[in-house]
Amino acid sequence: MWTKPKFEEMRLGFEVTLYISNR
């Protein structure tokens, strides 16, 4: 299980990347 802060940061970055890519 990953650390909570790291998991949130990775997920946030992933979502942002997808958002920019979809733009």
UniProtKB/Swiss-Prot annotation:
The keyword Plastid does not apply. The keyword Heme does not apply. There is a cross-link at residues 15-19 (Pyrroloquinoline quinone (Glu-Tyr)). GO terms for biological process: pyrroloquinoline quinone biosynthetic process. Keywords: PQQ biosynthesis. Pfam families: PqqA. Pathway: Cofactor biosynthesis; pyrroloquinoline quinone biosynthesis. InterPro entries: PQQ_synth_PqqA (IPR011725). Required for coenzyme pyrroloquinoline quinone (PQQ) biosynthesis. PQQ is probably formed by cross-linking a specific glutamate to a specific tyrosine residue and excising these residues from the peptide. Belongs to the PqqA family. This is Coenzyme PQQ synthesis protein A. It comes from Colwellia psychrerythraea (strain 34H / ATCC BAA-681).
